[in-house]
């Protein structure tokens, strides 16, 4: 929670669930410009689930964690529309600084017991560490590769080999840069059986690695695909050998494996892989750009006793924000 005297009078509460949101502000942090209208939908959805999660667990005796493995600076630079009839000012596009996932999570009430952020860039790490000046919460910041840092966190006390391990519960937000989340990391999180994972699966980035012909996939792309899917079965599923045809001179030509899988089939394979390690895989919240599926936001959990409750919160979020995603993605 923000320290006394630092709470903005402009904060508002979502009319449905009471999610606090930080509006447009100015900041001295390094610029972190990314995303578009779909980014706010993603952050709104995550924020709403965090509120639901904290309400559900607030009297259960657990220590709750918000874990953001690609936390950025805590805020983002964006262009927003200002003015209009109700403001009696001309409509114009202005640059603003909006709360990112870290600041939104820090504004959830009741607060999490611990906030854990990781980043690789020193300037972003410094910006995250500066959040301690504005919030009373226990904020832990780690610099390094997100996959490595998550392995350290969940293989160490209090998550492992500690008398209070049973008390630990977390929401883990994976909003990676490209295809940087390894399947081994998802497996590690599933094995805890105590975390809810929100994973922004980079559907478009994966498809871009899949050349039309299997021969067009170089070693680096193949390694990236093996890493994100946790197997090499994808090639057999996505590519089919075409019948060999003779050349103009009658010489035989070796068959060529051609990609036959559609974007929907590739996404279905990803869900199948998630389902192999998590007991619960939500329907995705599609995040579209110009009407095309670029990302899919999933909730994953391997905590069977809590799945009915998790499912109730997730289904509300997906149902609420899917129409908004389609509206804002129009070209």
Where do the protein language model's features map onto the residues?
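SAM cofactor-binding core of SAM-dependent methyltransferases
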Residues: 44-152
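A short, conserved alpha-helix within the catalytic core of class I
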Residues: 179-188
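C-terminal target-recognition/interaction regions appended to catalytic cores
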Residues: 291-331
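A conserved mid-domain beta-alpha-beta active-site/ligand-binding segment of alpha/beta enzyme cores
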Residues: 213-281
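Conserved beta-strand signature within the Rossmann-like core of class I S-adenosyl-L-methionine
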Residues: 193-205
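A short SAM/SAH-binding and catalytic strip from SAM-dependent methyltransferases
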Residues: 170-180
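Short amphipathic alpha-helix with an adjacent loop that forms part of the alpha/beta core around
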Residues: 150-165, 187
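Basic, amphipathic N-terminal segments that precede the first structured/catalytic domain
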Residues: 2-44
């Amino acid at each position: 929670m923000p320290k006394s005297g630092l709470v903005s009078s402009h904060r508002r509460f979502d009319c449905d669930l009471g999610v606090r949101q930080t509006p447009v502000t100015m900041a001295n942090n390094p610029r972190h410009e990314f995303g578009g209208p779909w980014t706010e939908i993603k952050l709104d959805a995550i924020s709403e689930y965090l509120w639901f999660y904290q309400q559900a667990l607030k009297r259960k005796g657990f220590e709750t964690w918000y874990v953001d493995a690609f936390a950025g600076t805590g805020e983002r630079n964006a262009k927003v529309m200002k003015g209009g009839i109700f403001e009696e000012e001309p409509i114009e596009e202005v640059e603003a600084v909006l709360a990112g996932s870290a600041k939104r999570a820090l504004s959830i009430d009741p607060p999490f017991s611990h906030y854990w952020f990781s980043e690789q860039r020193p300037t972003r790490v410094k910006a995250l560490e500066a959040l301690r000046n504005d919030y009373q919460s226990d904020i832990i910041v780690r610099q390094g590769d997100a996959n490595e840092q998550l392995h350290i966190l969940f293989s160490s006390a209090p998550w492992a080999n500690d008398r209070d391990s049973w008390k630990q519960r977390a929401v883990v937000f994976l909003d990676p840069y490209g295809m940087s989340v390894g399947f081994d990391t998802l497996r590690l999180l599933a094995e805890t059986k105590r975390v809810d994972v929100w994973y922004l699966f980079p559907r478009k980035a994966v498809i871009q690695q899949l050349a039309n012909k299997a021969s067009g996939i170089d070693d680096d792309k193949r390694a990236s695909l093996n890493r994100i899917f946790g197997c090499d079965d994808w090639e057999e599923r996505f590519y089919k050998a075409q019948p060999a045809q003779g050349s103009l001179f009658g010489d035989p030509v070796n068959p060529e494996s051609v990609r036959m899988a559609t974007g929907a089939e590739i996404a279905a394979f990803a869900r199948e892989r998630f389902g192999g390690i998590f007991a619960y895989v939500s329907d995705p919240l599609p995040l579209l750009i110009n009407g095309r599926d670029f990302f899919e936001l999933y909730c994953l959990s391997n905590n069977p006793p809590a799945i009915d409750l998790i499912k109730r919160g997730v289904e509300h979020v997906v149902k609420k924000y899917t129409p908004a995603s389609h509206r804002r993605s129009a070209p």
